[in-house]
Amino acid sequence: MTSTQSVAVCATLILAIFCVNDIHCDPIAEARAAAFGEREARSDGEWKQFDVNGEKIEVNEQENREIIRQAGGDGVEGSVMVIDHAKGLISWSIPRAGECYLIGGVDKQLPDAQELLHYFQSAQGSADGEGVESALDYVKAEDRPVTDLNLLAPEVREACQGKSVYWLEKSSGDNNEPEKRRWCVYAYVRVRGVLVRYRRCW
């Protein structure tokens, strides 16, 4: 791997890893195994945009917001996560899961827009570790559907029209229950060494 490829990517999405009766499926290992390539930075008004292996990370320091978009595949649109530090909300559209989600509160492990932008700019062209330092696990609150779609960020609101929207809550840490299910869909967002992940099992 070249020095360019070893540059840590602040945010990247790894979506749709399916585990079928596989108790050895290790999301952290899957994330570590991902290769991160060159990134291209450009500016669009207040938004600073970084293209990473076909994925787009947008940072707005003035609004303290971050958007992470993943390219789609197999006829399915890519997922979009909007981290709004000002409002303390995370909106997440995951087309492969067929639902949208809200997270109330932005974990302190996630860098705000200023920190993220500084990290991107200072790490540009330099080598840095790309290992996952920690993970934030979320599960769907089945009894907490979101009825007001206006809570969703405008960047995902249209994609969430007609879909079920739920609040996500931090996982209790019980990882055994999903292994009893037949199908699991994992969605990941990696933000400067912190893995934000959601697991939905049937």
Swiss-Prot record:
Matches recorded under Pfam families: BRICHOS
Key word Signal present: yes
Bilayer-spanning residue ranges: none
Residues making up the propeptide: 26-181
Cysteines paired by S-S bonds: 100-160, 184-201
Function of the molecule: Has antimicrobial activity against the Gram-negative bacteria E.coli and P.mirabilis, the Gram-positive bacterium L.monocytogenes and the yeast C.albicans.
Protein name as catalogued: Arenicin-1
Biological source species: Arenicola marina
Source species taxonomy: Eukaryota, Metazoa, Spiralia, Lophotrochozoa, Annelida
